[in-house]
A protein has these predicted regions:
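Glycine-rich phosphate-binding loop signature in dinucleotide/nucleotide-binding domains
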Residues: 61-65
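Short, conserved SAM-binding segment of the class I
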Residues: 84-89
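A short SAM/SAH-binding and catalytic strip from SAM-dependent methyltransferases
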Residues: 67-82
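Helix-to-beta-strand junctions that scaffold the AdoMet/dcAdoMet cofactor pocket
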Residues: 79-80, 93-95
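C-terminal helical/coil "lid" or tail adjacent to the Rossmann-like core of SAM-dependent
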Residues: 157-215
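Class I SAM-dependent methyltransferase SAM/SAH-binding core
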Residues: 1-60
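Conserved catalytic/acceptor-binding region of the Class I
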Residues: 83, 96-170, 186
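Core SAM-dependent methyltransferase catalytic element
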Residues: 153-154, 177-179, 221-231
Length: 231
């Protein structure tokens, strides 16, 4: 199962080649638009796409105790109740089934979003708006927190690695365009202020990240990689 499959690229390009003996991939995402896109552009005879929410047991219970392998890439940082998500994964897996997770714990994008929200120019626009900054960033959770949680749920932790990754972008333009596209606040900015918002976010990100030795803008994220087994 691919949890948080998005537009389906990982399922087709990564999971199908990685598991040559698989019988079926159930690829699920919370957003119907993502599933529509995946079915149109990344269809495959071995992949079944469905709208489902890993935090809502009722939407996934038809697969409980049937999944041998589960992958969730860059998905769990969006969850409001990560423990519930992990518990639902536990219920999905067969005995001996394994799950792999990769998600952001803390990042300079989160830090920049929090600073933008405090800026008097923008703060009134974002009152009551969900910024989707991960709880792990707010509460400074690290690998030991998740390792304990997963063991308490009943998983055997096979692999747990926390690592800060720094990525450089090819140009200021790419950097300036990319982050507003994944920032939850952008859609709440009036059209006539979009460019000003993009510039302010760009400057705040530069303040958080700086530039690499070649002068290119960069971004840091503290990533967690986990592999667990249901005993």
């Amino acid at each position: 199962m691919d949890v948080g499959c998005g537009p389906g690229g990982n399922a087709v390009q990564l999971l199908v080649p990685l598991f040559p003996k698989l019988e079926k991939i159930f690829a699920v995402d919370l957003l119907p638009d993502m599933i529509d896109f995946a079915e149109k552009h990344n269809s495959h005879s071995l992949i079944e796409y469905s709208v489902a929410n890993i935090e809502d047991r009722s939407s996934i219970e038809r697969w409980e105790n049937k999944i041998s392998k589960l992958v969730a890439l860059h998905c769990f940082q969006w969850l409001k109740d990560q423990r519930k998500g992990f518990c639902n994964v536990f219920n999905l897996l067969k005995s001996g089934g394994e799950a792999a997770f990769c998600f952001v714990l803390q990042s300079s994008l989160y830090a920049a979003i929090l600073e933008i929200q405090k800026n008097h120019k923008w703060s009134s626009l974002f009152e009551g708006v969900d910024d989707y900054v991960a709880n792990s960033h707010h509460d400074n959770y690290h690998s030991s927190y998740y390792e304990k949680m997963l063991k308490d749920i009943g998983f055997e932790v096979l692999y747990c690695k926390e690592e800060v990754k720094i990525d450089s972008f090819t140009s200021d333009e790419e950097y300036r365009d990319f982050f507003p596209s994944i920032c939850a606040l952008t859609s709440h900015v009036p059209a006539e202020q979009k460019e000003e918002f993009k510039e302010d976010l760009f400057q705040e990100l530069l303040k958080q990240n700086g530039r690499d030795s070649e002068g290119l803008p960069q971004h840091w994220g503290n990533m967690l990689e986990l592999v667990v087994r249901k005993e």
